Amino acid sequence: MSRLTSTFQVLRHANRKALIPFITAGDPEPGFTVPVMHAMVEAGADVIELGVPFSDPMADGPVIQKASERALVHHMSLGKTLDLVAEFRRADRTTPIVLMGYLNPVECMGYQRFVDRAKDAGVDGVLTVDMPPEEAGEFVPMLHRAGLDPIFLLAPNSSDARVQRMAALGRGYLYYVSLKGVTGASHLDLAEVESRIAHIRSLTDLPIGVGFGVKNAETAAAIGRFADAVVVGSALVEKIAAAQDRPEQARKDIVDLLAVMRRALDA
């Protein structure tokens, strides 16, 4: 059983919802990442999504695009991101780590080499934003054989057939994109999202996480009433951007926001 599956089972039995923060590896500089990952776990994170910096992050809004830019100034790469995961794993063997990024760096490294390195580093899941299930035929079986969970993005307009295909290929959880557009967008219609999640549940038994547009504890708590996990990204990355020259302040601001969200989810 994967760490992700085990984590969601434990949470389900405890009637709790997963809190999944996202940060970009190496933002604002590489030495910040691992300490803040540990701090996020202490603040109540159940899973961590770690973004792989990329020069053309088309699915990301301005906040996370700038995070990639800050990380790339320090020559961050997929390989260096995996090194950070391995460093995190030296002290934390239980918190699942999901790499979130684009296909190009994986293709440049080579599918098999990436899978081998990700497994060795202690990665648990791989979410490749621009790899639709129709094009995942070679990559996904490699992930399965290595015990890595492929995670797919569900859009509000995904057809039933597409949801079922992603559920058949995916492991760990499905990531429902609560808004049409890029990360960090606003105007979240919670009633519409809740209705959509209820329908998706009729098509798959995989846990469902909801992200894009989660800005505060109130929204996190509302999503937690019908989803299995709440993913928060841009709101945390904004804290890093606002205090990028003051790492201790950035870490405190991230921890404070996550702690409030954790309390709201558990209330």
From Swiss-Prot:
Enzyme class (EC, first level): lyase
Record-annotated disulphide pairs: none
Active-site residues, Swiss-Prot/TrEMBL: 49, 60
Listed GO CC annotations: cytosol
PROSITE patterns linked to this entry: TRP_SYNTHASE_ALPHA
Functional pathway: Amino-acid biosynthesis; L-tryptophan biosynthesis; L-tryptophan from chorismate: step 5/5
InterPro entries the UniProt entry points to: Aldolase_TIM, RibuloseP-bd_barrel, Trp_synthase_alpha_AS, Trp_synthase_suA
Reaction(s) catalysed (UniProt annotation): (1S,2R)-1-C-(indol-3-yl)glycerol 3-phosphate + L-serine = D-glyceraldehyde 3-phosphate + L-tryptophan + H2O
UniProt KW keywords: Amino-acid biosynthesis, Aromatic amino acid biosynthesis, Lyase, Tryptophan biosynthesis
EC number: 4.2.1.20
Molecular-function annotations in GO: tryptophan synthase activity
CDD domains, A to Z: Tryptophan_synthase_alpha (cd04724)
Keyword Cytoplasm appears in the UniProt entry: no
A Pfam cross-reference name: Trp_syntA
Family according to the record: Belongs to the TrpA family.
Database matches in NCBIfam families: trpA
Subunit structure: Tetramer of two alpha and two beta chains.
UniProt xrefs under PANTHER family: TRYPTOPHAN SYNTHASE ALPHA CHAIN, CHLOROPLASTIC, TRYPTOPHAN SYNTHASE, ALPHA CHAIN
Functional note: The alpha subunit is responsible for the aldol cleavage of indoleglycerol phosphate to indole and glyceraldehyde 3-phosphate.
Protein name: Tryptophan synthase alpha chain
Lineage, broadest ranks: Bacteria, Pseudomonadati, Pseudomonadota, Gammaproteobacteria, Methylococcales
Gene that produces this protein: trpA
